[in-house]
Amino acid sequence: MRFANVTIVLFLLLAVIGAIAGFIGGRIYKKSRMRARMPKHRGLKIEVLARDFTVCKVTDYSGVDLTERFCFVGKTDEENSLVCETSRVPSNTTVREDGWRALRIAGTLDFSLVGILADLSAVLAREKIGIFAVSTYNTDYILLKKDRLEDAVRALEAAGYTVV
């Protein structure tokens, strides 16, 4: 009888140890898989532009100086939009929203790259940071409200991006 009790206790002990080892091993495996799935573009350098921007609607583009360093124009059948430095907002602006800062993905992006903006916006969305994205031929820009800039930088760095 005694031998049977010892056998049962040993069996239960081994089962518990096996369950603990399986749990720990599973967590390690899951973490390594998560790291392996991290997007390859993490590690890209993100530049913080040292100027304030305004997003606005204009009646037409006659007052827009296209020789300025930063000037993003969007024209549709419904509106004429403009993103420019706050100090350069034209007088024929009908609606404007000030207080934006910009992040630029450094370098020239290849058109075959997929998911860069999606990943950046997902990182910022988890922190409840709204964005306004603008793309050029070479790269992408993310505008965000300047009171959330520090939060955005922290979140992007924690996600593996280099922010300068």
Where are the model-predicted features located?
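Terminal signal-anchor or tail-anchor transmembrane helices
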Residues: 11-25
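Regulatory modules associated with amino-acid/nitrogen control
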Residues: 21-123, 151-164
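Short, flexible segments with low predicted structural confidence
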Residues: 6, 95-97, 127-128
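Feature marks short, highly hydrophobic, charge-poor N-terminal signal-anchor/signal peptide-like helices
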Residues: 1-14
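A structural feature that tracks compact, well-ordered secondary-structure segments
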Residues: 108, 112-147
